[in-house]
Amino acid sequence: MSYGGGYGGGRGGGNGYGNGDSSYGRGNSYSNGYSNGGSNGYSGGGGGGYGGGRGGSGGGNVNGYSGGGGGYGGGGGYGGGGGAGGDRMNNLGANLQKQNWDLNTLPKFEKSFYKEDPVVAARSEEDVAKFRAQHNIAVQGPNIPKPVETFDEAGFPAYVMTEVKAQGFPAPTPIQSQGWPMALSGRDVVGIAETGSGKTLTYCLPAIVHINAQPLLAPGDGPIVLVLAPTRELAVQIQQEITKFGKSSRIRNTCVYGGVPKGGQIRDLAKGVEVCIATPGRLIDMIESGKTNLRRVTYLVLDEADRMLDMGFEPQIRKILGQIRPDRQTCMWSATWPKEVRALASDYLNDFIQVNIGSLELSANHRITQIVEVVSEFEKRDKMTKHLEKIMEDKDNKILIFTGTKRVADDITRFLRQDGWPALSIHGDKQQNERDWVLNEFKTGKSPIMVATDVASRGIDVRNITHVFNYDYPNNSEDYIHRIGRTGRAGQKGTAITLFTTDNQKQARDLVNVLTEAKQVIDPRLAEMTRFGGGGGGRGYGGRGYGGGRGRGGGGNFSSSNAAPLGGGRRW
């Protein structure tokens, strides 16, 4: 069957990351990426290294890392002045022109493509209810299409199905079974599903079909599909999926996020892209400076809407949505359904239909074994080491360690490396190219231990993480569920180990509720804590956070944590 084929072969090439210029920067600024001259690509005695021409004159190499003093960014530190920085929040969008939309004069567009397969149509309401119950699918709203049980029943055109089948998936995930017919029908959709449920493909494939039914982009046109995401990591992850499945249609995309130079992103937007995946701050920056516009957007996705609101992006999201025609199709995806997300949906989605996988109550993935140990603060490192010794007996294991602050993340990484463990850390003060490198080392298993702050608790999609270790308990149970959701994905089992102190006592009751719902064993000392209110105030460890401002040469950035030499007694 066909969905209209405006695109055919008439689309330019250059799809994917950066359209021809994905380098990390040139010349003195980054010393050709990772800086030549040192073993393992580290700065090794001169050159600008990452620090942007600040020196890097370290002494001899130790285990391939530059020794004494210089290290990765020399005395200036990795951040070289401001750290990686996220999207700028202050006054964003102040110069955006208010749009007055007259739907009578706007060009019409097609958004309804779903034609129910005869096999699906023949299923009784009883069969449909049984399928939904088996797969924990709950739906709300009028005239919701029946779920599909196979890829072929979804009725995607051949150019999409070829790519899907090449991935070797046996059948659609529950969110895809119900979400594809909903999204293809052109309706506004709210999807509530845990991380790792397959939601990215649930909106990506209908987006590709949508694009192929629209007129070709003209010079100066902005994107047709806009995907908003909370973090750079998630944005890049989404881009990889769209690149993979949009390849045969020659759909062009770009990823627009802060913390990296704008040049490549601006060039992509100027050439014309059908899909723009963006974090809110950098996108507003691009619109305000006239580098793109959202007049052609007819398919909008808000991914991890709850996380975007948690991170304070609501004013930016509302400004962006005001730049998009109101008769667009909007798909909103979220792991949870708090009142803030409900308010956003009711303000910006029209007559939406909703699909929910699992309970709307705060609940953890039941494939994850949750172990919570009540410890004192000074016991933590010893406990962590003992767990690592056991976990890393299996060389295929990958462990993600969460800390409450950037300082603790760097301290722990340095401690582990000096103890011989191949650990690297990632957090908001690391420059983007360091974060990319660390993530790649972790993904490929070269460094199977990654220490992270909550910047990585959502939006980093690394397959086969076998263990999550909460060195510090997060501020609330919702973040706890998001953190441990990095393991046990795509039908796999996982293990989450959490160190819980009296400082976290305020969170004990919520945590016990999560553990009870998932039928987990509860430490008697944790159960005891729930009898008392008050307690340590739930501040988490480390108080004020660390490192905002000037960068810290040799103190907590690449030169002293990720580039710390591995101790002599290698542990792995």
Curated annotation (Swiss-Prot):
Gene it is expressed from: dbp2
Phylogenetic classification of the source organism: Eukaryota, Fungi, Dikarya, Ascomycota, Pezizomycotina
Cross-referenced Gene3D superfamilies: P-loop containing nucleotide triphosphate hydrolases
Name of the molecule in the record: ATP-dependent RNA helicase dbp2
Sequence motif DEAD box, location on chain: 303-306
Residues covered by region (Disordered): 547-572
Keyword match RNA-binding: yes
SMART domains: DEXDc, HELICc
Biased composition (Gly residues): 547-557
GO cellular component terms, semicolon-separated: cytoplasm; nucleus; ribonucleoprotein complex
EC numbers, comma separated: 3.6.4.13
Main location: cytoplasm
Keywords per UniProt: ATP-binding, Cytoplasm, Helicase, Hydrolase, Nonsense-mediated mRNA decay, Nucleotide-binding, Nucleus, Ribosome biogenesis, RNA-binding, rRNA processing
Domain of life: Eukaryota
Binding site for ATP: A193, E194, T195, G196, S197, G198, K199, T200
Subunit relationships: Associates with polysomes.
